[in-house]
Amino acid sequence: MDAGMLLPIFSLPSSSGRGDFSQAEVYLKFLRAAGFSYWQILPINPVDAYMSPYASPDLSAGDLLLLDVAALEREGDLSTLGQVHYGRKIDALFSHLKLKKVEARMGFQNFMNEQGERVVAAGLFYLASSRYGPFRNWPLEVKKDFYSFRNAHKDDRRVRIYCALSYLFEKQWKRILECAQGYGIKIVGDLPYYPGIDSVERWMHPEHFLLDETLEPTYVSGVPGDGFSDEGQLWNSPVYNWKALAADDFAYFRKRIDNALNRYHCLRLDHFRGYEKIFHIPRGEKPAAGHWEAVPGEALFAPWKKDPRFLIEDLGFLDEEFYRFRDKFSWPGMGVMALEGPRPSSRRPQIYYTGNHDTDPLPLYVKKMDEETRRRWREVMGGEVNTENLLDYAVHRQEETVFFQHGDFLQTPGRINRPGTCRGNWQWMLPPEAINDDAARRIKLCLRERAK
């Protein structure tokens, strides 16, 4: 059995209030010592106002909050900044960056030759957002004419700084990938399905979404009632215009996928059900008013049909049509203990998870478990329902790969996200002692003993 650990980079220990790249190499060393083969992270694109990486203002950019400030200081890219709280980090980076020094580097020039169009667009969106606020408040002429705004402001100092910081982000991330390879750890990335309601994608390519004449959504995203919410969930992102996306052979989406495959060793496709059909909710209505629309997912993924680097999130409202679509690909699906309980799912997943970012880690799962679920677990395990026995169950399912949440191994873990809520999510962090040598030995021994 190969073991993987699920932990967002923002959950790494940090004194700034939010994890970043500064502890990534330490964590990779910890994972190797603990016997893990995979590190699954959440998206590393910019986050929304609620810190969610799944409602990003730019699905292709990097989250500048993740930059390792101390490393930038050591390499002379920043004037001395010192400790800074994450809430002030972006402003501090903009004011302390040695812009001309970074721009003079051959690496930066090569980066801009390869990715300049995308990165400049991201910088322009940052500039316009700081000037006008939420997209709905932008002047209509700015909303509807990205290219005129670009021509007028592409050389603005703030846009140039954004491009330079984006280069430094990719440089730091490349170093982390190389470190992971050196430790024999594969990093599993995550491809969100939708951008957020305010996004550079909506501004730069409005034809890719179902929008009205003022570029406001006619439909928004969400899901009907499911195991997370009886009334359904309203995600509120503008929905894709799949006819328009298909008309140019999915160039936008395929470029996103190619970029993600270059950024990670393996790639999880979030909300894979959305590539077979997707739920449309009329703007201003509740999820109950929504309906399903077909999506040409088989054509979209044709170039990667046999590519082994993908895994898919096949959770939520699933039907026979979805399973027929899913089974046209060779990619493993997911089974999640905290969602399925002791009964296996209707198909055998190739990757098993104790939980994901939307569920409690095992100690909290046990603590909150209702009596009926506890009774079913006792029948299956023939003993007490506790974290240790659930770890036994996960290890002995005979799956090729099992993923754990780091919180499964902690006395007082926290939860990453509660679906259907906005506040208090995407903030949980590991205590520093959770990734020391003793912790690695304990986890390695724990899994080794259970694998016997």
For every predicted segment, state its role.
Residues Q23-V47, N262-C266:
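Catalytic domains of carbohydrate-active enzymes, especially glycoside hydrolases
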Residues Y27, I176, F322:
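Aromatic/hydrophobic pocket-lining residues that form π-stacking "cages" and hydrophobic walls in ligand
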Residues L168-G182, K186-I187:
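Active-site pocket-lining segments that scaffold enzyme catalytic pockets across diverse folds
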Residues L6-P8, P13-G17, Y50-E170, Y194-P413, ...:
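Alpha-amylase-like alpha-glycosidases and glucanotransferases acting on alpha-linked glucans and related
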Residues V188-P192:
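Gly/Pro-rich turn-and-neighbor structural signature
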Residues F36, I185, W331:
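Short glycine/serine/threonine/alanine-rich loop segments
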Residues M1-Q23, K29-G35:
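Mature N-terminal, pre-catalytic/accessory segment of carbohydrate-active enzymes
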Residues R423, A440-K452:
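C-terminal accessory segments of extracellular proteins
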